[in-house]
Amino acid sequence: SSKIKISGIDVIDPSFGMEAIWIESHKQAEAESTGYMVVEPESVLATHFSRILFRNAGKLIGQDDVQSLLDNLSESAPQLVQSVIPKIVPLHSLTGVMRLFLDERVPISDLRQVLETLSGMNLTNMSIQDMSEALRPDLAGLLIQRLAPLNEPLPVITFSSGLEHMLINMVRQSGEEGLVLDNALAQKLITSLVQANEKIGAEGKQAALVVSPAIRRQISAIVRQHIEDIVVMGLSLIHI
């Protein structure tokens, strides 16, 4: 970035939330010579639209889409597909799991691993949410690869031990109601996470919030309402 001011329209980049300036095309050379990175309007729009699709992928995928993925997998693993869908898991349940994965930025490219894991699980009385949580450890590698380049450290955000223990106790006490935070605590929590996430994002990196598996689902549901691009991972998925 440049500290030299150039004339244009001050805006916030819609994709990354960073300060930017719309300039006329004839000012490109001037902007570049003073240290600005210039991006073509088409690229800005394409990036913005792709991020919108990415954020809403869970709403867009349906049973026909999942069936197409299964048909592709059937070409290389026909017995696996036939033995799991729909004998063990109905198509609508698998679609629900895929939606939850996409909502939380978990890659669904390794459908073979998903079915292999499902084939060995006792799914009695398991909800779609329970299935997705049980499958996450087998997809942790893909998720981490998406967040951090190979051989690069994964930037993580964690809670203090005192706060995490308090949240775990709150989840245990609330039972089926889920985690309910009072406004003051929720605001303080979200503000701190936004600041930490923005600091890491300013370095061009993607952060992961790492918490106890006992509260991962509940924390993710709360945090994603305010910070769309953060990934909430259970500590058991991180191998130290």
Tell where the protein language model's regions lie, with residue ranges.
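Membrane-embedded alpha-helical signal segments
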Residues: S1-I238
